[in-house]
Amino acid sequence: MGKYDFTSLPNRLGHHTYKWKEAETDSEVLPAWIADMDFVVLPEIRQAVQTYADQLVYGYTYASEELIKEVQKWEATQHGYHFDKEALVFIEGVVPAISTAIQAFTKEGEAVLINTPVYSPFARSVKLNNRRLITNSLVEKDGLFEIDFDQLEKDLVEEGVKLYILCNPHNPGGRVWEKEVLEKIGQLCQKHGVFLVSDEIHQDLALFGHKHQSFNTINPAFKEFAIVLSSATKTFNIAGTKNSYAVIENPKLRLAYQKRQLANNQHEISGLGYLATEAAYRYGKDWLEELKQVFEDHINYVVDLFGKETKIKVMKPQGTYLIWLDFSAYDLTDEKLQELLRNEAKVILNRGLDFGEEGSLHARLNVAMPKTLLQEVCQRIVTTFSKL
């Protein structure tokens, strides 16, 4: 029994909780989709929020020196990434930060590359900013996603790619990219004059002995064309507080980024976000270690159960609390798959096609919930698909 509570299910109904929205009108459905957790928050974060609530004024705020130091300390101690405070740029979320990077480092009509399947806001951000989307398909090998570097270089060159958005660690596949992989990516970007944005929001959730490598720690030369995005929000389940950060060590890139951020009026951050992030990084190390043990147990449970009881192929993640499920062994269409999950099993998973065309006949399962709830979700899936 650990110090923290990962067995109680907080009441999320009636709180405008996006993940549980459908459950408010259909009491039978269980959500296991959007990437937030159904766990009680770190007590020190709750205390910081309560202290904030006790203030008599909720006005404009700024990033304190204490917050900046906590972010620097966390990145240094957890990931070996040391940087000057001037490199740190706060912004309300990693997805808005990606859009800002697209606007700052490319022009309308220019090509932006992503590795698919991948988190759907990548493609959306490229398209809605009127850039040309280039998709480089990941290859599945030995139960993991890999990058086809020959095809990647071909895409970079032939499509005239200006910006590469990397998901590190990868969502939905849970791949924790090794140093050698990141080195190859950086060399190609350096060779062909491509800017790179590394979305590292899942950085703290490397599991099963794997270690996250921040892109800007791989090679000092890569800092000239790369920026790193991260946040405490995914790790500590505080996405509603709205705070993330970019680390931009090249002063010219940082100036261009901040200019675009100012043009978008994205420079004012929630005081609640600042305080929650500071508390998370100051007090959250032990909580995180327990959380990762919970995730490893939950992932092993899913792998074992589906492996024994179904034809669902499970991509065991090296990190994150998200599992990529392959239903292609069943004779189904994508529409029928969704119908079975939602209407018969009464569970909500992320639709595979939302991550790209490679997601056909796939779904993404979120295991960040008390194990009793996860068991119910998985048993419903087993019951439904054992009939096929």
Language-model segments: what does each one mean?
Residues 31-38, 50-68:
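A glycine-/small-polar-enriched, mobile loop at the entrance of the PLP active site in fold-type I
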Residues 9, 58-60, 147, 215:
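Short clusters of hydrophobic/aromatic residues that line enzyme substrate/ligand-binding pockets
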Residues 59-92:
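Conserved N-terminal alpha-helix of the aminotransferase class I/II PLP-enzyme fold
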Residues 4, 24-30, 35-50, 83-84, ...:
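PLP-dependent class I/II
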Residues 1-17, 25-28:
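Conserved PLP-binding active-site segment in aminotransferase class I/II-type PLP enzymes
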Residues 2, 16, 56-58, 162, ...:
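Intrinsically disordered, low-complexity segments enriched in small/polar residues
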